[in-house]
A protein has these predicted regions:
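Short, Lys/Arg-rich, polar N-terminal cytosolic tail immediately upstream
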Residues: 1-2
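Membrane-embedded alpha-helical segments of integral membrane proteins
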Residues: 5-53
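Lipid-exposed faces of alpha-helical membrane segments in multi-pass integral membrane proteins
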Residues: 9-19, 70-76, 80, 236, ...
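Acidic, low-complexity intrinsically disordered regions
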Residues: 16, 32, 58-61, 80, ...
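Structural signature of transmembrane alpha-helix termini at the membrane-water interface
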Residues: 19-26, 49-50, 79-87, 243-247
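Transmembrane alpha-helices and immediately adjacent membrane-cytoplasm interface residues
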Residues: 43-91
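A structural signal for short, hydrophobic/glycine-enriched beta-strand patches
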Residues: 80-237
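Membrane-interacting alpha-helical segments
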Residues: 233-240, 244-247
């Protein structure tokens, strides 16, 4: 069956979006947020170009309706979580002198990755604007990192002009949940404000806020943008991460 021009254009858009999601492969990056949207986009392109294939596969009416219902519910849930994530990233009206928590991510050798540097920059901006505020640099060390994420964050903040005495390192965490749980322990031990400004990517703010509230903290956002070629996959991965957090 020969596809019509609108179907061909739609399929081309799907494949271009698929290429965008898979772009980080060129940097050796692979994660679930790149894979599940790409698979759905390829299926959508095939559906547009060869609808007869899907008609043969979904001959039974009950099966067609089951697939449609599952896709519809999944899409509605994903859009709902996406809207919630955007709202969480906009929650920036923190009380004066809140405690900053910088959430760690990949360190390249001893230097921050592009993503981590943007988080450090967001934290440094807040700390310069609030000279009495303190900061927790949170993140452990993985096998391919020469120093802990906390140590890297601390060094980058000092290089940005932040007084070392204002920075409390937390170098044991290996997940967002541990970032917030261990940071909450440090904050209480040091007698710091439990109003916290979370310095992380915009896509990460919702899940971080959920864990912060679970740990008895009141979260606000100091979000930063993700590099354009990384953003689609990380937002998609985080949608799955939020869904998993809510279900477990």
């Amino acid at each position: 069956m020969r596809a019509r021009l609108p179907a061909k254009l739609g399929a081309a858009v799907c494949l271009l979006l698929c290429a965008w999601f898979l772009a980080p492969l060129g940097m050796g990056i692979v994660h679930i947020g790149m894979l599940w949207p790409s698979a759905l986009l390829v299926l959508a392109a095939v559906r547009l170009l060869r609808p007869d294939v899907f008609r043969r596969l979904l001959r039974k009416k009950w099966l067609r309706w089951t697939v449609r219902a599952a896709l519809g519910l999944g899409l509605a849930a994903a859009l709902g979580i996406f809207g919630w994530m955007v709202s969480a990233a906009a929650n920036r009206a923190a009380p004066a002198e809140s405690t900053v928590i910088v959430l760690g991510c990949q360190v390249r050798g001893t230097e921050p990755s592009l993503t981590l540097q943007r988080r450090v920059d967001a934290a440094a901006d807040y700390l310069r604007a609030h000279p009495q505020a303190r900061c927790v640099a949170s993140g452990g060390q993985s096998d391919d990192e020469e120093i802990s994420e906390a140590e890297c964050i601390r060094a980058a903040l000092i290089a940005a002009g932040i007084d070392p005495a204002r920075i409390e390192p937390e170098d044991q965490s290996t997940s967002t949940e541990e970032n917030l749980r261990f940071s909450a322990e440090r904050i209480r031990a040091a007698g710091l404000s439990t109003n916290v400004v979370i310095a992380s990517d915009n896509f990460h703010q919702l899940r971080a806020a959920l864990w912060a509230r679970h740990c008895g903290l009141t979260p606000y956002a100091a979000g930063c943008r993700t590099a354009w070629f990384l953003a689609p996959g990380y937002w998609a991965r985080e949608i799955a991460g939020v869904a998993y957090t809510l279900l477990t």
